[in-house]
Amino acid sequence: MMNESLTEKRNELSLSFAALGVVFGDIGTSPLYAFGQVIKYFPINDHNIYGILSLIFWSLIIIVSIKYLVIVFRADNDGEGGIIALAGVIRQKIKQPGGWLLFITLVGIGLIIGDGMLTPAISILSAVEGLESLSPNLAKYVLPVTLIILFFLFKMQSIGTGKIGVYFAPVMLVWFITIGILGFLQIIQNPKVLMAINPYYAINFFMIHKYFALFILGGVFLVMTGGEALFADLGHFGKKAIRTGWFAVALPALLLCYFGQGAFVLMHTEDIKYPFFSLSPDWFLPVMIILATLATIIASQAIISAAFSILKQASLLNLIPRLKIVFTSKFEKGEVYLPLINFILALGTCSLVVIFKSSSNLADAYGIAVNLDMLITTVLVGIIAYRCWSWHAFKILIFLLILIIELAFFAGNIPKLLTGGWIPILIAFLGFVVMYTWHCGFEKLRELHHRDALMDAFIIDELNQNKISRQPGMGLYIIDPYDCEGESLLHHLRLNRIFFENMVFVSIKIENKPYIPIEDKFELIKKAEGFYLIFIHYGFTENINLPNELDEMFKRVYLPFDIIKNKLIYFIEIVFVEMTGERQKHMYLWQKHFFSLMIRNAVPDIQFYQLPYNNTIAIGTYYQF
């Protein structure tokens, strides 16, 4: 029993250690730019620095430690976190939640795309800017070095991070220990800064500066960027490992670093461009720049991988067009590479670096996307607490308090809209337009298939009465998500009158859960003599390999005919959309053209379901929009 307990503890510590290299990369590198961004607005004196440090301390405690690690962690979807997981929990409880949930989900995904561009840009740029601390003459190399690092970062996505990923956690552990020690060395020289733990200084800061203090919250918010990753990566490491990593390593190191920067600037009141690098002794500065660059690369890798993961889930749920998905690891099922998304992120990130040129300028664009993402999380978890946990009104007030605090941060971020904050909003809006247009087009296809279902119902009767001649063999007809029960393929059979002796229609259903146990995965319905409908249920995080799944199904589900695997013939549908020029419900003409473009360029079923090319027949179907 004792050995089992020790083994369990070792496993938990191992997971906590691994989490350092993924979960805490973004929030762990915020000290590079966050504190310097805040202090530039005020003269350096005890009242201002204590007030800023107090705001930083209580922001990390209330929003990250209490909101995320205590409350939001309760809202996991079978151990999985993130906005799609939260939406899935709500859909399980509220069967028809309405358009508001779709709207929030699409906006949240759009913000994640923006975050995937901004995080690598500001993180790596802020690390390379340490060269200016070595020598002002090196300032001209900051931009090209940053772009070179970003180029190789996105280039290596196609080969995966399996081989180098094992070094992420050790590097981040060294990073946290280093910034903690550097901060501590400054605190012992000016220990009075620890008084800022008292919330009085945060309140006093607002009383002195009044409305202008609200503006500073936009800068303070930067210390929490990356906090949403703690919940998004829940499925990879679990609650206990992330909580241990945060409270034992990340949070103490961050607080020591921020308070150390506060102590340093109070002892050196001259203009300090990069207070973080000023903590480092001159002899250690080159090492610190290299370590900071490695840490920001790891932080950037984490957000890129998260973007791949969330967009893969969105693709499975048909929130976006089907994307080419490359699995870069034989051992880690969640390690995927999306070539198109990688290109978009790379182009966006490099463009941001060239346009803004410095981390200080980029900071204005950065915080607002994460702020909105956190607001969405608060709203969704509040709904879950009310509808799923049956929290009474008093407990729900906790969410109201958190919402007020986050809205105050959002108010502080609003002035940034004029100096770059509009960029993540624009990215999210463009992402929303793509996803909403795709959704509207899918709904139109569903409507057309419903009409076909009414026309083709008589085929079932003819099959039952043996009025249709059949040829030997078996056909597997893969039903698209917009097709309820294979009406389009049934319509094809009605037209050409080619019916196999045994026909199996296979429908893929993506559920609102991350994983579906094998015993609940398959569902067989006999529609007519020799005509079967099979539902295969997937979770939104699972990988689809239809031939492998069918092999498993044939072992578990009884079919009254023999299956010869190498002679199976798969039938899939290729959709062609023809424009009518008329405006239809929820779709303008430009949306119809855009949907037609997307569906033509989406990954075809044969790739998406990993079907054998030599045994697959594609049937083209035209639809009038």
From Swiss-Prot:
Residue ranges that the Swiss-Prot or TrEMBL entry lists as coiled coil: none
Transmembrane region(s): 15-35, 52-72, 98-118, 134-154, 164-184, 212-232, 246-266, 284-304, 336-356, 365-385, 394-414, 417-437
Keywords, ordered alphabetically: Cell inner membrane, Cell membrane, Ion transport, Membrane, Potassium, Potassium transport, Symport, Transmembrane, Transmembrane helix, Transport
UniProt keyword NAD, yes or no: no
Pfam families, per the entry: K_trans, K_trans_C
UniProt subcellular location: Cell inner membrane
Its membrane topology: Multi-pass membrane protein
Catalytic activity: K(+)(in) + H(+)(in) = K(+)(out) + H(+)(out)
GO cellular component: a single term: plasma membrane
InterPro entries for the chain: K+_transporter, K_trans_C, K_trans_N, Kup
UniProt GO molecular function: potassium ion transmembrane transporter activity; symporter activity
Superkingdom, taxonomy of origin: Bacteria
Function recorded in the entry: Transport of potassium into the cell. Likely operates as a K(+):H(+) symporter.
Family, per entry: Belongs to the HAK/KUP transporter (TC 2.A.72) family.
Full protein name: Probable potassium transport system protein Kup 2
Originating species: Legionella pneumophila (strain Paris)
Gene of this entry: kup2
